[in-house]
A protein has these predicted regions:
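Short arginine-rich
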Residues: 182-192
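Predominantly a Rossmann-like dinucleotide-binding segment in NAD(P)-dependent oxidoreductases
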Residues: 1-67, 193
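Glycine-rich phosphate/pyrophosphate-binding beta-alpha loops
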Residues: 38, 64, 88-96
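A general structural signal for well-ordered alpha-helical segments in protein cores
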Residues: 40-41, 156-157, 183
Length: 213
C-alpha cells in the first residue's frame, strides 16, 4: 500500500445539536472527527495496516460557534509499514451531506468507496484481474435511506455468531480503541502544533475543553 485517504463532508446544523445537549461537547462527545468521521477513520486505519508511527493534525471551529469542539479536522498519518494516510472531515458542508469516501492506492490496485456513507464501490481496479470491476461495482451499490446505512447489521450478526460458536469476532473492541486513539492523537497534535508519536497514553477529550473559546 502507498497511501489511503478518508474524506467526510457532511452537514450538521443548529437543530441537530439542539436535539441532544451532549453533542459537540468535549466532555461527552468531541467534534466532527470524533463523532461523524470516526467510522471512516477506523476503516482507513484498518485497511492501511493498522499500526501507526506518527500523525500531525489541524482542527478548527469555523462555523458552529454554539458547540465546544471542532467542525473541521485534517490530518496526515505515517503508518509503520511506510504507507501514508490523509484524513479530512467536516460538518460544514452546505446545504446537506455531500460524501463519505475512502480511497486506497497500492502498487497493484486502486479502490474508491464513496457515496454519502462509504456505501458505493466507485472504483475497483487490480492488476490480477480476479474480479470484474463492473460486477463488483454493481454488487456493492447500496442506497440506504440515511448516512447510517446498513453497515452495523453484518457486524451485529458476526458478534452474535461469534458468541454462539465460541470464536473471536471479525472486528473486536480493540479495533475501535485504535480508531479512538488516532482521533485523540489528531486532537493532541492540533493543540500542541507538533507531531504526535504512537502509541499515546493518558489522553482525553476533556483536556481540550476551552480550546476554541
Amino acid at each position: 500500500m502507498f497511501y489511503g485517504t478518508a474524506h467526510i463532508r457532511w452537514c450538521r446544523d443548529h437543530e441537530y445539536y439542539d436535539r441532544a445537549n451532549w453533542r459537540g461537547t468535549w466532555e461527552q462527545d468531541g467534534g466532527a472527527l470524533m463523532n461523524q468521521c470516526i467510522h471512516n477513520i477506523d476503516l482507513l486505519r484498518w485497511m492501511m495496516g493498522d499500526e501507526i508511527d506518527e500523525v500531525v493534525g489541524m482542527t478548527d471551529r469555523l462555523h458552529h460557534d454554539y458547540i465546544e469542539a471542532e467542525d473541521l479536522g485534517i490530518a496526515l498519518i505515517k503508518f509503520k509499514n511506510g504507507a501514508y494516510g490523509i484524513v479530512e472531515g467536516t460538518t460544514n458542508v452546505y446545504p446537506k451531506n455531500l460524501e463519505e469516501t475512502l480511497y486506497l492506492f497500492g502498487e497493484k490496485g486502486t479502490v474508491k468507496a464513496g457515496g454519502q456513507s462509504v456505501n458505493i464501490i466507485e472504483e475497483w481496479n487490480f492488476s490480477d484481474m480476479l474480479d470484474d470491476p463492473d460486477e463488483v461495482k454493481a454488487q456493492y451499490h447500496e442506497a440506504p435511506p440515511n448516512v447510517y446505512g446498513f453497515g452495523h447489521t453484518p457486524l451485529y450478526a458476526d458478534v452474535i455468531e461469534a458468541v454462539q460458536t465460541d470464536r473471536a469476532p471479525y472486528v473486536d473492541a480493540r479495533a475501535g480503541k485504535r480508531a479512538l486513539e488516532l482521533v485523540l492523537a489528531i486532537y493532541q497534535s492540533a493543540a500542541t502544533g507538533g507531531i504526535v508519536k504512537f502509541p499515546i497514553t493518558e489522553c482525553s477529550t476533556i483536556q481540550f475543553k476551552g480550546r476554541f473559546d
